[in-house]
Amino acid sequence: MPEARRFDRVLAILADGARWDVVERLATAGEMPNLRQQFLACGGLRCATSVFPSVSGPAHLPLLTGLHPGRANLPGIRWAERPLGKRGNFLFRTRSYVAPWRPAKLERDVPEGVRTLFHHIQGLADVNSWFVRGCPLAARMTRFSKGVTFVKAWVTADWHAENAQAEAAVQRAWQRGFSSVCAVFPAIDELGHRFGPESEQTLEGYRRFDASLGRLLGELHRRGVLARTLVLVTSDHGQSATHTHVDIGDLMRPVYPRTLIYPTLWRHLFSAQAAAMVSGNSMANLYLQGEAGWHERPDFEAAGGRPAELLARLLNHPAIAHLIYRRAPGIYVLAGRTGRAVVDARSVGADDGSGDGSQPVRIGFTVEGENPLGYAPLPGQMTRDEVAALTAGTGFPDGPWQLVEFFRSPRAGDLIVCARAGFDLRSHFEYQPHNGSHGALEREHMLVPAAVNARWLDDRPLCTADLFPTILSALGLPVPGGLSGRSVPLGG
């Protein structure tokens, strides 16, 4: 293998909501000329698998921390913690990051031992990151402008202004002497939600992002540091088009009349029988009391019980693609209308499955009835790498392993709902019309670009958790253990 290339600074960009197939198509066609010339031409543009849930916030963590959000106990952009007693008291037990004070909430919610790029890279400035642990206040370039820019963009319906703000903040960081920057560019995601992921308005967002990227590359060249700067562009998730909105709470109330749901938390806050926390609008964590109360977990396979009734009702609804639940500790079921896929992860320990390959543990995979993920027959036992390789070209890439990682979170719901493509799970209280959704295991949600101004030297399937250790290695910095991804060498 050729000698790995080294850099002494980094510009890491997360283009929120950018879908792999759209980026590949536009770059190949020359509509994103900077990505084509500076990344595709040198072998630096690849597809990567994101994480489940494929939503902003949790899906930012692989780049920022090298961890799947399940390991950081973040099962969604909204989640809850089950009540401790028999009554359904959810006071102070719910969370939404679609609200002010995201960094403070994430600082409290993510386990204390989780470290970020800001801890590892000296002189790293932040632009629009959600999780800023380890970043000095002086290095937070958008601490105040982020919220102001969002409100202005919402009022004027000019979501391109968010990317203009991000570009200006990156330039400002360099002017203030910061050698490295980690930046989130939000516009593609907002445009995709508003107009649809492949609308002309959203495609124009991709083109304008590429123009911003070109200006930033030009500034690095003008400063004489482009060759020494690792430039990395990725995303947290894609989107699929949405034509029908369904309220998951309405589907639950015939079985659980006292269902708690955002933002009307005052209803049943102290006496809920169930709670629904929607993320990305295509995925929801449902929390359900057992037959004897909240001190008991629901049993979805006990005939005649309310959990089984809800499962059957949801599976028969046209908006629902998959339901996921724990059959037993370490055994997870993904149910469709005509069959179930069962993942047995009992052999996977707390630190097993690390991306460095030091723990090549195997998970079990069996199908009852028809395979709800549509896979060709798979081996009954697979390593993490085998799961990634064998499912890469399917409609649900890396699905079995994503369940293993997701259920590491104690906050994960009792029942996980994934909407069918074209539908979502939230019909009220959105700040703008939603014609694009994400959060589920769908290919369009899970596959994102991973671009570097170098050449990837490893052709194994790539995931976004690989980017954190890859950045550290490329900068000559030590890579901590226990990560969800592995370092991938980069060539010239």
PLM feature segments, named:
Residues 1-44, 483:
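Active-site-proximal N-terminal segment of extracellular/periplasmic enzymes that hydrolyze or transfer
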Residues 7-23, 38, 63, 121, ...:
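Beta-strand elements within well-structured catalytic alpha/beta cores of enzymes
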Residues 24-73:
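Short, structured active-site-proximal loop/turn typified by the sulfatase FGly-forming signature C/S-X-P-X-R
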Residues 49, 54-55, 77-105, 222-230, ...:
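Secreted, luminal/periplasmic, and some membrane-associated catalytic domains
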Residues 60-200, 205-208, 333, 339-393, ...:
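His/Asp/Glu-rich, glycine-adjacent segments
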Residues 204, 266-282, 293-307, 445, ...:
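A short beta-strand-to-alpha-helix junction
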Residues 321-335, 477-492:
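Polar, surface-exposed loop/tail segments
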Residues 408-466:
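Low-complexity, glycine/alanine/valine/leucine- and proline-rich hydrophobic stretches
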